[in-house]
Amino acid sequence: MGVEKMKAAFENGKKAFIPYVMGGDGGLEKLKERIRFLDEAGASIVEIGIPFSDPVADGPTIQRAGKRALDGGVTLKGIFQALAEVRKEVQIPFVLMTYLNPVLAFGKEHFIERCLEAGVDGIIVPDLPYEEQDIIAPLLRTANIALIPLVTVTSPIERIEKITSESEGFVYAVTVAGVTGVRQNFKEEIHSYLEKVKSHTNLPVVAGFGISTKEHVEEMITICDGVVVGSKIIELLENEKREEICEFIQATKQKEEA
């Protein structure tokens, strides 16, 4: 499990499609069922959001999903239990997207113990600056759980090199300024930014934030090693448009074979 399992998602030129689901949106049984569906549909990795009351990096769709989960009484303990149960049925790598506050409130050591029990392979902490990652990075390294770095369009080359040189799993390249959410298109400089990130790390580079159409997927996958689709996946799951999710996954696979 852990770092090696995520490496396998990118082996031999594979392109990774990484859908995002909000933990507990619709209940914990729904979370398990959605993970089973995404695994069967051919997703490479599943990113599970931990609902939080002050989600500064999230756009309106993900904020609403998190609020639904919290209003429904979902807890971090409950999410870990659901993941541990569904882990027995699926092999797909789990990556948690969590803000730092829930980790600290739960207790760092306890959080990582539960990650191990639930079969979590990596975590993303969007509000944890690189300079402060020692709050949790050594514990994760010991547990063989990847702390996945985020880099942005405004990150200088030196910072990208520094961040990625000490990281594992993959690099999450944020493709827009601001919060997550559906976008119509991407500025041309995004291409050169992604190529810059790719040229300064040996890790797979995954594009995320704002990717919401098959055309976006096809555009990004020609430059990157994978894509994260969040807000759009939440919308499609909420409206039971699962065939469209399968089309997203197929678009990734077709680019892989091209």
From Swiss-Prot:
CDD domains: Tryptophan_synthase_alpha. Keywords: Amino-acid biosynthesis, Aromatic amino acid biosynthesis, Lyase, Tryptophan biosynthesis. GO terms for cellular component: cytosol. It is an enzyme of class 4 (lyase). Its EC number is 4.2.1.20. The active site is at E47, D58. It catalyses: (1S,2R)-1-C-(indol-3-yl)glycerol 3-phosphate + L-serine = D-glyceraldehyde 3-phosphate + L-tryptophan + H2O. It comes from the Bacteria. One of its GO terms (molecular function) is tryptophan synthase activity. Pathway: Amino-acid biosynthesis; L-tryptophan biosynthesis; L-tryptophan from chorismate: step 5/5. Gene3D superfamilies: Aldolase class I (3.20.20.70). Tetramer of two alpha and two beta chains. The alpha subunit is responsible for the aldol cleavage of indoleglycerol phosphate to indole and glyceraldehyde 3-phosphate. PANTHER family: TRYPTOPHAN SYNTHASE ALPHA CHAIN, CHLOROPLASTIC, TRYPTOPHAN SYNTHASE, ALPHA CHAIN. Belongs to the TrpA family. This is Tryptophan synthase alpha chain.
